[in-house]
Amino acid sequence: MAVGLGPLSTLHPVPGFELGIASAGIKRPGRKDVVVMRCAEGSSVAGVFTLNAFCAAPVTLAKQRFLGEVRYLLTNTGNANAGTGEAGLAAAAQTCAKLAELAGVAETSVLPYSTGVIGEPLPVAKIEAALPAALADLAEDRWAEAAAGIMTTDTLPKGASRQFVHDGVTVTVTGISKGAGMIKPNMATMLGYIATDAKVAQGVLQDLLRDAANKSFNRITIDGDTSTNDCCMLIATGRAALPEVTQASGALFAALKQAVLEVSMELAQAIVRDGEGATKFVTVQVNGGATHQECLDVGYAVAHSPLIKTALFASDPNWGRILAAVGRAGVANLDVSKIDVFLGDVCIASRGGRAASYTEEQGAAVMAQAEIGIRIELGRGTCSETIWTTDLSHEYVKINAEYRT
């Protein structure tokens, strides 16, 4: 059950960006599993992609094409088209070619995305058969339906939207994401699509997305597995009656950057809240590092520890497991006598051992909550990083043991 994640809030339409949904029956008959997105002519597009060496065929194709003119994004669920070799690349290209033919655009202006089971051939004929219905469904107000259409093991659709006013003009930023397992992005299975009607030069848009992703999608982890199919795209349609953003400065850029970051963080945290089998939403904050990287190393050592994650599931304040994870994070010359560890606001460990004021009852009270904070003070410098993760439950094992059945 998703932790603190309710129904979708209002997802504002983005002028110049349309979405259409259809059923191809890839994994289950009747399921809406194909989503087509249409970008207005002249849109600029940015993308960040998985660093997994076995990246999926659609990722390879999208990376090759997104810097050119982009008119359509084609997403299917139920099949990842990963681990499929040259045949997978040909299949992805074939579905793009069919959509391009139906829409009357260049084949290279169609970007493919897939999510689902790895290693199975893409059912090209089923996807092609669903394309006319998806095109007929295109509309600017279909964000919620598209959010549901890209789900796999997700239990709830994920979306976020922000608006701000600049010089009397309303600018919209809206996005959707999917993912619940195989989540440890490095830009899981994670897909994210964000659109704005601001007009933004491609280079500025790319930097804006990369910065937002590094503070959101690249700071979440459920199981430590980086997917073959991770992608996050940011589309700027330019339909808002404002000057083009051509550099990373000025009031319009600052407002847009904040809106994109807020949408990205909400989408990323929604993925964690809906983590497979998750019963806890956990914020791991590491402060006082000499570098940002060592803060991340410590944070991920804690967030990825099966012993800590199972203790979280059991609501067991086993603070020794946290100390052990910090100690094996690989931080050079770590002085444990300077480290303090907190569960919520409760200091559980200080100067290398149990805090003098700590009681088991205090720790148990924090661990019983659905949302838990673990704060680690390294006492080495001024750098900080935050990571969001989950516990590890019986249900996670069950979901993944039965995934292909």
UniProtKB/Swiss-Prot annotation:
EC number(s) on record?
Answer: 2.3.1.35, 2.3.1.1
Q: What class of enzyme is it?
A: transferase
Q: What is known about its subunit structure? A: Heterotetramer of two alpha and two beta chains.
Tell me the residue numbers annotated for binding substrate.
T152, K178, T189, E276, N400, T405
Give yes or no: UniProt keyword Transferase: yes
Q: What is its main location?
A: cytoplasm
Q: Where in the cell is it found?
A: Cytoplasm
Provide the GO MF annotations for this entry. glutamate N-acetyltransferase activity; L-glutamate N-acetyltransferase activity
Query: Is Transmembrane a UniProt keyword of this protein?
Result: no
Residues marked Involved in the stabilization of negative charge on the oxyanion by the formation of the oxyanion hole (site):
T115, G116
- Site (described: Cleavage): A188, T189
- Reading the lineage from the top rank, the first entry is Bacteria
Catalytic activity reported: N(2)-acetyl-L-ornithine + L-glutamate = N-acetyl-L-glutamate + L-ornithine; L-glutamate + acetyl-CoA = N-acetyl-L-glutamate + CoA + H(+)
The job of this chain, per UniProt, is described as: Catalyzes two activities which are involved in the cyclic version of arginine biosynthesis: the synthesis of N-acetylglutamate from glutamate and acetyl-CoA as the acetyl donor, and of ornithine by transacetylation between N(2)-acetylornithine and glutamate.
Q: To which pathway does this protein belong?
A: Amino-acid biosynthesis; L-arginine biosynthesis; L-ornithine and N-acetyl-L-glutamate from L-glutamate and N(2)-acetyl-L-ornithine (cyclic): step 1/1; Amino-acid biosynthesis; L-arginine biosynthesis; N(2)-acetyl-L-ornithine from L-glutamate: step 1/4
Q: Which GO terms describe its biological process?
A: L-arginine biosynthetic process; ornithine biosynthetic process
What's this protein's name? Arginine biosynthesis bifunctional protein ArgJ
Q: InterPro entries, from UniProt?
A: Arg_biosynth_ArgJ (IPR002813), ArgJ-like_dom_sf (IPR016117), ArgJ_beta_C (IPR042195)
Keywords of this protein's UniProt record, alphabetized? Acyltransferase, Amino-acid biosynthesis, Arginine biosynthesis, Autocatalytic cleavage, Cytoplasm, Multifunctional enzyme, Transferase
What is one cellular component GO term in this UniProt entry?
cytoplasm
